[in-house]
């Protein structure tokens, strides 16, 4: 998907079966549906090793991989195929990780599109700086407390699935209640803990919303003790973690989160329009409508009575 940001679908020689079987929620496949007609180069997915034989059959000039867990795996694939293997990274966080900029720079160099790579890196910096500039000077005591639930962790999960040091909250300098645990990355919390925190605003990943809704039907009493539920302060964000991060969607989510938490600082932002601006700048085409069709888009969630 990083290569898709170069807006040249004809550079691809093959596609993994996993991409064809699970296209939902992947903006790069909405933007370039023709990619699903490419020859299959293996099963794909995080648990399958690359299929050297099938890769060889499509005669690529270079193999980009993000799932080579170590140098040895990349070297082995290069040895088997005789084709240069280049290892890229999405980094550790969902947005604005320096490793992404490094990866884009490397791709640009290899495919002869260094100018586009520079433009992409500059765009990432621009979004990061804009989000930070809007929010960094807001005093802590003026910020609502926030919580994100329903985050995917190798599959969809309910409201207890969250993150400490959550990069989208960090992008808008939000007060993440989970940060007081000192834990980072994916965390499963107890419902009792959520009642204790009682965050002002709750965000739910749309991919996890069905699990949250099921749980709500079973445990209405728990949900109804939460202030955010009582006051209608539950909001849906678009899922961005399908077979690693869709950076475009994550940035769009960060703008929506900013708008919900600090309406004054984001007065000029219409989240749907901003999402399409981001998709257009990175992928070359607006795909928010398709994401919204699949997941319901950015919205306030009203739990049934």
What is each stretch, according to the model?
Residues 1-57, 62, 67, 177:
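A short, structured surface patch at a secondary-structure boundary
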Residues 72, 91, 133, 187-193, ...:
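Alpha-helical scaffolding within the catalytic cores
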Residues 8, 80-82, 172-173, 230:
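Short, structured coil segments at secondary-structure junctions
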Residues 69-80, 206-218:
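A ligand-binding cleft/hinge motif common to bilobed small-molecule-binding domains
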Residues 52-56, 166, 191-192:
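Short hydrophobic/charged patches on amphipathic alpha-helices used for structural packing
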Residues 63-66, 201-205:
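Periplasmic-binding protein-like
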Residues 157-185:
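Alpha-helical, coiled-coil/dimerization segments enriched in small aliphatic residues
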Residues 73-154, 178-179, 233-304:
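Extracytoplasmic substrate-binding proteins
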């Amino acid at each position: 998907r990083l290569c898709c940001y170069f807006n040249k679908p004809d550079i691809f020689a093959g596609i993994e079966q996993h991409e064809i079987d699970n296209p939902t929620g992947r903006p790069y496949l909405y933007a370039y549906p023709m990619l699903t007609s490419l020859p299959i180069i293996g099963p794909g997915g995080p648990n399958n090793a690359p299929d050297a034989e099938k890769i060889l059959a499509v005669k690529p000039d270079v193999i980009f991989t993000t799932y080579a867990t170590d140098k040895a795996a990349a070297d082995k694939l290069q040895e088997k195929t005789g084709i240069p293997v280049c290892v890229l990274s999405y980094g550790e966080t969902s947005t604005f990780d320096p490793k992404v900029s490094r990866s884009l720079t490397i791709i640009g160099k290899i495919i002869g599109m260094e100018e586009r790579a520079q433009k992409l890196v500059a765009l990432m910096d621009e979004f990061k700086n804009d989000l930070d500039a809007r929010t960094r000077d807001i005093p802590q005591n003026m910020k609502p407390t926030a919580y994100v639930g329903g985050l995917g962790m190798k599959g969809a999960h309910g409201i207890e699935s969250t993150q400490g040091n959550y990069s989208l909250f960090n992008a808008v300098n939000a007060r993440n209640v989970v940060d007081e645990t000192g834990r980072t990355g994916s965390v499963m919390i107890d419902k009792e803990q959520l009642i204790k925190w009682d965050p002002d605003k709750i965000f739910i990943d749309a991919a996890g919303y069905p699990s949250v809704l099921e749980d709500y039907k079973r445990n209405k009493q728990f949900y109804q003790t939460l202030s955010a539920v009582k006051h209608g302060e539950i909001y849906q964000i678009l899922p961005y973690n399908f077979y690693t991060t869709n950076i475009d969607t994550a940035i769009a989510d960060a703008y929506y989160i900013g708008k919900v938490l600090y309406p004054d600082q984001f007065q000029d932002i219409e989240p749907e329009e901003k999402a399409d601006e981001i998709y257009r700048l990175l992928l070359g085409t607006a795909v928010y409508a398709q994401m919204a069709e699949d997941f319901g888009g950015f919205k306030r969630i009203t739990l049934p009575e």
